[in-house]
Amino acid sequence: MQQAKAIARYVRISPRKVRQVVDLIRGKNVSDALAILQFTPKGATEPVTKVLQSAVANAEHNYEMDTDALIVKEIYVDEGPTLKRIKPRAMGRADQIRKRTSHITVVVVEKKEG
């Protein structure tokens, strides 16, 4: 069974926030997944949609799969490097701000007939 894959690396959004969105579309038909993402009011939907569309394009152009029969086999989020910043506080103190990044991976496969 052939599968197409797409990865978005160093996306500047927390992995926890992206996982909330990713959990909604795991195992779904690609067209259903895109519809769910379109109507989900979260900031993470934009990068997830972009990666999913990239995986579909890879399936179509590299493996000549039927885009109507694609399902989201795997979708997961890994933690990328964290950017550390400092926020000045009162009395000469400073707090550390962690700007987290994510790596989003999507694998799509063609659904078998029958």
Swiss-Prot record:
Pfam annotation, one family: Ribosomal_L22
Keyword field contains Ubl conjugation: no
SUPFAM superfamilies tied to this protein: Ribosomal protein L22
Superkingdom of this protein's organism: Bacteria
GO cellular component: cytosolic large ribosomal subunit
GO biological process, one term: translation
Record keywords, A-Z: Ribonucleoprotein, Ribosomal protein, RNA-binding, rRNA-binding
GO molecular function per UniProt: rRNA binding; structural constituent of ribosome
Family, as annotated: Belongs to the universal ribosomal protein uL22 family.
Known function: This protein binds specifically to 23S rRNA; its binding is stimulated by other ribosomal proteins, e.g. L4, L17, and L20. It is important during the early stages of 50S assembly. It makes multiple contacts with different domains of the 23S rRNA in the assembled 50S subunit and ribosome. The globular domain of the protein is located near the polypeptide exit tunnel on the outside of the subunit, while an extended beta-hairpin is found that lines the wall of the exit tunnel in the center of the 70S ribosome.
HAMAP family per UniProt: Ribosomal_uL22_B
Quaternary structure note: Part of the 50S ribosomal subunit.
Protein name (record): Large ribosomal subunit protein uL22
The organism of origin for this protein: Desulfitobacterium hafniense (strain Y51)
